[in-house]
Every structure is written in C-alpha cells, then in structure tokens.
Amino acid sequence: MQFAPSICQQCSIGCNISPGERYGELRRIENRYNGTVNHYFLCDRGRFGYGYVNLKDRPRQPVQRRGDDFITLNAEQAMQGAADILRQSKKVIGIGSPRASIESNFALRELVGAENFYTGIARGEQERLQLALKVLREGGIYTPALREIESYDAVLVLGEDVTQTGARVALAVRQAVKGKAREMAAAQKVADWQIAAILNIGQRAKHPLFVTNVDDTRLDDIAAWTYRAPVEDQARLGFAIAHALDNTAPAVDGIDSDLQNKIDVIVQALAGAKKPLIISGTNAGSSEVIQAAANVAKALKGRGADVGITMIARSVNSMGLGMMGGGSLDDALGELETGSADAVVVLENDLHRHASATRVNAALAKAPLVMVVDHQRTAIMENAHLVLSAASFAESDGTVINNEGRAQRFFQVYDPAYYDNKTIMLESWRWLHSLHSTVENREVDWTQLDHVIDAVIAAMPQFAGIKDAAPDATFRIRGQKLAREPHRYSGRTAMRANISVHEPRQPQDKDTMFAFSMEGNNQPTAPRSEIPFAWAPGWNSPQAWNKFQDEVGGKLRHGDPGVRLIEATEGGLDYFTTVPASFQAQDGQWRIAPYYHLFGSDELSQRSPVFQSRMPQPYIKLNPADAAKLGVNAGTRVSFSYDGNTVTLPVEISEGLAAGQVGLPMGMPGIAPVLAGARLEDLREAQQ
C-alpha cells in the first residue's frame, strides 16, 4: 500500500494516522506513533471511519447548473465561468468550515476579503469556541497534551461526554485514574513494567474522577461520582466547587444539603491532589459550563496546585478556525437574506448542521450565485449553481489545529487522477486561489503548499508556528525524497493495465518532501519526524515503531511532529461571575439535551458504510415521568415540530435524564447539533 503521514479528521483531538491506499481507494488507517499525542492508540471512529473517502457519489469533476441539470466542466471552464460571475457580483461572501484546513479557509478569506469571511459555525457555538480559546490563552492554566493527561491525579469532567466526543481523551483519563496503583507500587519500589505486581498492590485503588453530564456516560464505571443533571445545574455545580475552593469566587445559592455534601467530597479530593485536571468543552451547548471549568481551575491554581485544563471542541480544525476569526454563520445568512450579498462561496461545509435547514435553504435560494467547494455530496448542493470538486484529507495537504492548540500537518496519500484521468479533484485552497487569480487576471502565486503557509503567516501572525509543524518541500535525506511506498510494494506496472499497457509516469509531488513511489528514503534511523509507515528489517510493520523511538514508549527519535500555538500566559482571567439559574421543568415545554455517539455524531464518518451498520437509529429520550404524562412507552413514535418541519422518532426511556428535558442524538442525519438547548412545545404521540 501507499502511505503518508496524516491527521485524523473525525474529532478535535488530532491523533496521528497513516492512511494506506491501493488502486485508488483508501484501504486502511494505521495508528502513527506520536509520543506527545496518541502514542500507540486510536479510537474506532478514527481507525474505521474513512469510508466517506471511497464513496462513489463524491463530486469528481466541477459541474455547473444549466436549468434543472448539471453539466460537467473542465478546470479551465470552471475557473472562467466562476470568475465571470464573481466579477459581476457587487458583494461576495465566503463561508468557511471547521473541517477544512487552515490553508483552505485562508484561501477563501483572501478571495472574498477578511470583512466578508464567515466561519460557517452557528453564533452560539462560535461564542463558546472563542470563550474556550480565551480560557486557554489568557487563563494562565496549562493545557496538557493528550499523553500528559495520563499523569494527573484527580480529574473533573464538566458537561462533556468524552468517550463519545473525544474518545482518545477518555482512554487517557482511564490511564490517569489507574495512576493510583502505580503510585502505591512505586512507594514499594516496584518497577513500572511489572503490571501484575502493580495490579496486585493497587487492588481497586483509583485516583478520583468526577463526571457531570445530562445522562449516564461510559466513564461512570471508574468515576467516584457522576452527576446527572441539566446543563445549567452542571455549571452551577462547577461554580459551587470553585467557591468552596476559594471564597472570592462567586457563590451559588439554593444548593440542597445532599449536593453540598457531594461538593465537599469533590473539593477535598481536588484540593488534596498535586495535579488536578479539569476537562470541559463546547459540546454541552453552554458557555456557563466552560466558565465554571475555568473558575475551578483558577481556584485550584490559587491554592498552589499544578492544575491543567483541557477543552474539547467539535471538529478537527475548530480551534484553528476560532483563531482565524470571522463572522458567524448566522451573520452570513443575514447578509444573504437582506440581499446585501449576491454571491456566496461555501467551503467544505454542510450548512444544515450549523443552522436550521429551512433558513439555510431560503437564504441560499435568494442568492444569484451559490458556489460550493466540497469533497462530499451535501444537501446544499441542491441550491448550488457551481460545484468545485475538492480533495478529501487523503488526496490533499494542509494544516489543522487540535483542541490543545497544536498545529499538525497532514499529507496527500495518493493522486486520484493517476487511476482515472477524467477526475479533477484539487485541494480547496488550490481551487480558491486559482479562482482569485483568474478574477484578478494574474498568474497563480501559490504553486505549492509552502507558498500558502508563508502567505498565512504574513497575514496572521498568530499562525507563525505552523511553518514549523513539518519540514518544507525542499527537505531531503541524503538528497532523496521520502518514500510513500514500502520497497516491497508490488504490481505497479499491472495496476493500470486494464486502462492501458503503457505505464504513465508516477505523479510528481511538488508540495511536499514525499515521493509517490517506493524510490526514496525510508530508513528507521533517518533524521525525520514525519513517518509515512513503520517498517524495519525483521519486524512486522506496526511492531517496528520501537525502531523509531528514543526509548520504547518514549518520544520519536527526532522529535514528535507538530507545534503548540497556544501557551498559558503568566497572568490570569478574573473569575466569571454570572452563575446561571437552576433548570426548572415547565409543563408543556421540553428542552433538548445533547447526546453524542462515537459512531454517528460526526459529519463525515457517519457516511461510511461500516458505520451506518453500527450507528443507533435516531431516537428521542424521555424521563419515565415525562413518558407517563404523554402516555407513551419505549418504542412508541412521538413527533414534534421544529422550524417548520415535523420530526417523528421512537421513544427511549432513560432514568438518568432529568424531567422536562428530551434527549436527541446530536449530529445524526436530520438532527443538527445546533438543536442543543432549544425548546420544544408540541411533543405528542405520532399519528399512525
């Protein structure tokens, strides 16, 4: 197979992967060792969720609408056609995406101008993202790398179901909790590798873990206590813990004595820990939860603890897009609705996930030109006048920024045009820059990835570090490029024999230091950190990683790839003082509580056929008391209308969900994550 170093695109943690391709299809994803991030482990979403790259219905050539049909264009026609329309438009806006790379979002921003660039994230979600970034940058609290999470000795998870939204963090938390047994063994001078002895000494001793969520989580089995409550009440718990740790933090009134006793236990555990860790994120749909997490961390820091804070975002490049800035999707739709913008370019974004489908469709229908650049067939293509066929992560290069602010580069695995010369799939940044150049009647400036990165750094100093995330295209080892294929790669002459017996030249990669070939350097001892695949003489491939490490289980011999862009400052934020009121259930009104699923909540991996067989069917969760009031049982279909659409789903009963709320699986087909926290008024049994 042909490999390249890449970054997992299915959540915000940024695990390192080696995707393998054969015959123009992605065939598997292997874990790529990074001693600072994921070391030996990947979650199942990352390992098996790549099926969307191989879908047959992906846009493979640019198409333009003619009446009710689309006609296929070549690259030149697409650029000229789009440029003609953009020249006539009085105002062009661009809608970016948290699943597109820094380079692609920047190319769109350059095309439309910084003041016309919108992030493509809903306003509420963007506010939470900016708040999380503010806490990480200015809070004065250290953000640990994924590997470092394992060294903490007390963990508080506020409002985030980490097993479903950042599964690799959940594994790190499990390892952290086990640290108690290792400590006890170390006190008896037992070596770290003697696992049987450590388990024997530790028995069931664990470091304390406290979890808050709207319902049960998969971490409950190792948690000292789980608080199942509406999101506001979870935030109130966080504020109360912060006040108990430091009485200058805002107080919370109206807490009953049972809960106060639990708070005392949590405070004792956190205050007694040397290295407490607070985990929160944007997925609960609440800014107050993030503020509460920041307050707890600040209170612990004030007591002299070596405290860490981890924020989990929603998409692979959410943090990068937050650092870039721009208006929210709601602002962009407002521009289209008022008619002040008459052309819109949408980059790798299914807008139905970030705003109500009715509003998106109405806004796009008003625009004389809708241009979509994407590698998946999304619902908004129904409204598109021109579709540019972009390359997915496996066919392109770029930089993404993970939840801790680590910039990491992913590289192209294969060139799809080698197997089918009718395919015209370019990186989004290439399409957008080519269009920009055509509109301005000038030559293309960015002929390779390094040019884009230099342009990003010149325009946005906050991204200066991305230059160091990986070596540039001129990097060589003993004058050689690095091989993407192991030297036992076989049958290359026969691969295209069904098309033509004349073998064409291998694709030439001018963007990176890799070659689409087995010819090149692949020595384990070579001075490089970007490793496409692990191979060493006498070792089966994935077991060869020990040859690339400075010590077994340590860092890579020549340093782990990636560079941190966010470091905690010396100062700190003041305490957040707005404590939310507690949740009050109201008759005839229900609030949507967010549930997430590792298989199904992510926009791209839910398209993979293997995931579709593992995904739960969409459901609506009710508390038993609410179900009794409505007169429904598990399995009964209930319907509600939201935003002009009627949704009908089967009921599931959950004891953990508080009355007055309904649980929906966020991100599943037809259930946009933007629904979290919305109110429903007309929940009723569906008419058969």
Q: Each PLM stretch: what is its role?
A:
Residues A271, P276-T338:
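A glycine-rich, hydrophobic/aromatic-adjacent loop/helix-cap motif
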Residues S89, Y152-D153, A223-A224, A273, ...:
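Short, well-ordered alpha-helix to beta-strand connector turns
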Residues M1-S257, D264-V265, R528-Q543, K547-G562, ...:
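N-terminal export/assembly segments and adjacent metallocofactor-ligating motifs
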Residues S428-T447:
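Non-catalytic, well-ordered alpha-helical segments in soluble enzyme domains
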Residues V157, T163-R218, D330-N421, S437, ...:
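A cross-kingdom feature strongest in bacterial/archaeal respiratory oxidoreductases
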Residues V92, F117, L209, P276, ...:
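Hydrophobic/aromatic residues located in beta-strands of well-ordered beta-sheets
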Residues V92-S101, D258, S280-G285, E348-H352:
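Conserved short loop/turn motifs at secondary-structure junctions
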Residues M1-Q2, P98-R99, N283, A313-V316, ...:
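A glycine-rich phosphate-binding loop feature that marks nucleotide/adenosyl-phosphate handling sites
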